[in-house]
Amino acid sequence: MLPSIAKHAALHQVNPLRKHGQNFIFDSSLCDKIVRASNLAENSRVLEIGPGTGGLTRSILQKNPESLTVIETDERCLPLLNEIKEYYPNLNIIKQDALKINLTDLSCDIVNSVGFAYKKREAKPITNRRANDIGESKLIDYKVTIISNLPYHIGTELVIRWLKEARLITSMTLMLQKEVVERICAIPSTKAYGRLSVICQLIAKVEKCFDVAPTAFYPPPKVYSAIVKLIPLENPLSIALINKVEQITKLAFAGRRKMIKSSLKNLVPNIHEVLTQLNINDNYRAENLAPQDYLRIAEIL
């Protein structure tokens, strides 16, 4: 039987390190609550970033997924995670920086095991009957469920990256800084509304689940956290269109208080005609335009 999360960490002398952005969760009931919020279906393929001391990992595994792949960069946590694997053979552990992994680099090895095997770029391709050839790369035709307590310093970057691979994702249930979650879920004409709101809401249905107090962590961070769930919409946007929306929103929200006709004039010299054609008031500011307005501008350019 596994020891408690906190005792397991103590046995392996795993203390949180600032350089890894680590704030550990030792409360198993909170971990269970996060997994419940994900509505994780049995036999799902799950991905977790930064499992650390394995609290959330345990709660996911107790839901009997087909496989759980964890990406951990801290070598100190690997022996601890391998001990959990002794009880749950469907746990796959990859030591890697999460920012260096794309979902398309995670391939299901259906010959030797159920779950994921990481395809290093220099390695021979994994034979996979469940993938479709696209040039030299593989497009996975199954989807993963992502459940993670993300390090604050890379959380937003990972969310944007994953949204660009939304076709591979069933849902994402993520712990992030509360301020970031509020930005993801913000509606137009509010203070929190911005680029992140637009991009997330054009690609996924977003829902804030609940707040998490600093006291839930060791050591306690200086800010509140929150759980957000993102479910990719059907018919995801193309990468080209997402990139265009990113370009437009970067200009628009850089001058947040400027009228949109001024913010975008360097991108589109005839911006007044474009906005008129789309029936968008060119006296609006960036925060007044809905996500769909930005998409319509991107589509017409």
Curated annotation (Swiss-Prot):
Keywords recorded for this protein, A-Z: Cytoplasm, Methyltransferase, RNA-binding, rRNA processing, S-adenosyl-L-methionine, Transferase
Cross-referenced InterPro entries: KsgA/Erm, RPE2, rRNA_Ade_diMease-like_C, rRNA_Ade_Mease_Trfase_CS, rRNA_Ade_methylase_Trfase_N, rRNA_adenine_dimethylase, SAM-dependent_MTases_sf
Transmembrane portions of the chain: none
Catalysed transformations (reactions): adenosine(1518)/adenosine(1519) in 16S rRNA + 4 S-adenosyl-L-methionine = N(6)-dimethyladenosine(1518)/N(6)-dimethyladenosine(1519) in 16S rRNA + 4 S-adenosyl-L-homocysteine + 4 H(+)
Enzyme type, top EC level: transferase
Main location: cytoplasm
GO CC annotation: cytoplasm
UniProt superkingdom: Bacteria
The protein's Enzyme Commission number: 2.1.1.182
Name of this protein: Ribosomal RNA small subunit methyltransferase A
